[in-house]
A protein has these predicted regions:
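N-terminal periplasmic/intermembrane-space "pro-region" immediately following the signal or transit peptide
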Residues: 22-96
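Detector for outer-membrane/organellar transmembrane beta-barrel domains
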Residues: 255-375
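Outer membrane beta-barrel
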Residues: 75-104, 114-228, 242, 247, ...
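Sequence/structural signature of outer-membrane beta-barrel proteins
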Residues: 95, 138, 152-156, 181-183, ...
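Bacterial Sec-dependent N-terminal signal peptides
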Residues: 1-26
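Conserved small/polar residues in nucleotide/adenosyl-binding loops
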Residues: 431-438
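Transmembrane beta-barrel architecture of outer membranes
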Residues: 162-164, 204-206, 243-249, 259, ...
Length: 443
């Protein structure tokens, strides 16, 4: 515990040191005042401001998503523009008094007792660096027309991996994107790419529809490509799925950067019972409440999720392959387990360029039908604590420091812990959030 308090004290002290430095910085770097430049390449500049507005209006709200691009290519009529952008991010990580077996801080991946004697670990990562192309336009019949593709280098061997590829118009979105059973604008800022262990986060090929039905009220519904991650079992095969996943939500916003959201998801998970040579299905479902609110210089974040058979949507539990699990003593049969995840966070803005946040999160897998008895070393509960400070040095550079502490508890009540310090430097486009803004401002 002493090491935790020392690390937290260092972060607070760092924030106190950085804050007064900003006043000096504005004198040294006057370019920080006012917006940065956008380079527009076009024979005709008519409509350029309108196109820039489309980019800003359709900005993705997640903290790790790139902001509006610096370079725009427009057509001669000024009706369409192609944006090219992204960022380069490098992170240094040091684990102590326990390690996590991944570049992301995932409590579920804290090694089992006796599996390693290593208690400290140093890593560096640049694989979350992102590039994107975004085509936007205002059309007479289709409204704002958006084509967006983005990717980073999280593929096998740090190869390029697609993160988004979708088309959007008139409220419809089709393609590959983050799922609808999540609230990107309510996610807290972290250097850690995965984020809180109890947060919902996933990507899927989908067709969705979202609409503002009245002032402050927004609804959405979709169909998503199913993917079932189950625990291997004798005489059971998990493969082809017969039904899409169906998510939906209702969201109410009462002010800029302040909203509450209630969502749900329904899924049918098919597996083959090879004992009886029969295809069977289990029903999974989840409910979620989330929100964010601004109170003076503070921004609050929170989310609570509960359901059955929704493991792949929860950050920590998605690593366990427990969407469906074997039913004890019954060959060829599977079951769905209850599970939950939640987090609560707070961000404070010291100045227009410096902000800090802290978040606590928890995820829990429950047992039924003697599952825990036959899986004593299986994950039961994970906890995740993060505190960080960010400094937007200029329009093109953001640096950050972060402390993380994680706990993993098994069904046999064996506990393990890990600690990590993250330091990051990230190049950013000119419209990257200032400290007094949050991702919630973008919805």
């Amino acid at each position: 515990m002493k090491s935790i308090f020392k690390s937290m004290s260092c972060l607070v002290l760092g924030a106190m040191i950085v804050t007064p430095m900003f006043a000096q910085q504005k004198k040294l770097y006057p370019e920080l005042e006012g917006p940065g430049p956008v380079v527009i390449i076009s024979k005709d500049k008519n409509g350029k401001e309108e196109l820039i507005n489309v980019f800003e209006e359709t900005q993705r709200p997640h903290f790790h998503d790139p902001r509006a691009p610096r370079f725009l290519l427009t057509d001669q009529q000024g009706k369409f523009a192609l944006g090219i952008g992204g960022y380069l991010k490098t992170t240094m990580e040091y684990d102590f008094n326990g390690i996590v077996d991944d570049v992301d801080f995932i409590p579920a991946l804290i090694p089992q007792p006796g599996s390693t004697s290593v208690r400290n670990q140093f890593q560096m990562d640049a694989s979350t660096s992102t590039i994107f192309l975004k085509l936007v336009g205002r059309t007479k019949h289709l409204g704002n027309f958006i084509v967006y593709t983005a990717g980073n280098f999280r593929g096998s061997g740090k190869t390029f991996e697609l993160q988004n590829a979708y088309l959007s118009f008139l409220g419809f979105t089709m393609g590959y994107d983050t799922g609808l059973f999540m609230d990107l604008a309510a996610a807290p800022p972290t250097i850690d790419f995965q984020g809180p262990d109890g947060m919902t986060f996933y990507r899927a090929t989908q067709l969705r529809y979202e609409a503002n039905v009245m002032k402050g009220l927004k609804v959405g519904v979709g169909v998503e490509m199913p993917s079932v991650d189950g625990t291997p079992a004798q005489d059971v095969r998990i493969g082809k799925q017969r039904m899409p996943d169906i998510p939906a939500y209702v969201q109410y916003s009462w002010a800029k950067a302040s909203h509450i959201r209630v969502g749900g998801i329904l899924r049918s998970m098919t597996y083959e019972d090879q004992v009886n040579n029969k295809a069977k299905s289990l029903t999974g479902w989840g409910i979620q409440a989330s929100g964010t609110a601004r109170l003076g210089g503070f921004q609050l974040y929170g989310q609570y999720t509960y359901g059955r058979g929704i493991a792949q949507y929860l950050n920590d539990i998605s690593n366990l392959n427990v969407d469906i699990v074997p039913l004890a003593d019954e060959s060829g049969r599977m079951q769905v387990l209850p599970m939950k995840g939640w987090y609560a966070g707070l961000q404070y803005n010291f100045s227009k360029r410096v902000f800090a946040s802290a978040t606590y999160s928890q995820s829990r897998l429950f047992t039924e039908d003697c599952y825990a008895h036959f899986n004593e070393t299986q994950y039961k509960k994970g906890q995740y604590l993060v505190a960080n400070v960010f400094w937007n040095v200029s329009h093109n550079l953001q640096v950050g420091a972060e402390y993380l502490h994680g706990w993993r508890e098994n069904f046999n009540d064996v506990n393990r812990e890990a600690n990590r310090i993250n330091l990051s430097a990230q190049s950013v486009s000119y419209t990257h959030l200032r400290a007094h803004e949050t991702c919630a401002d973008l919805v």
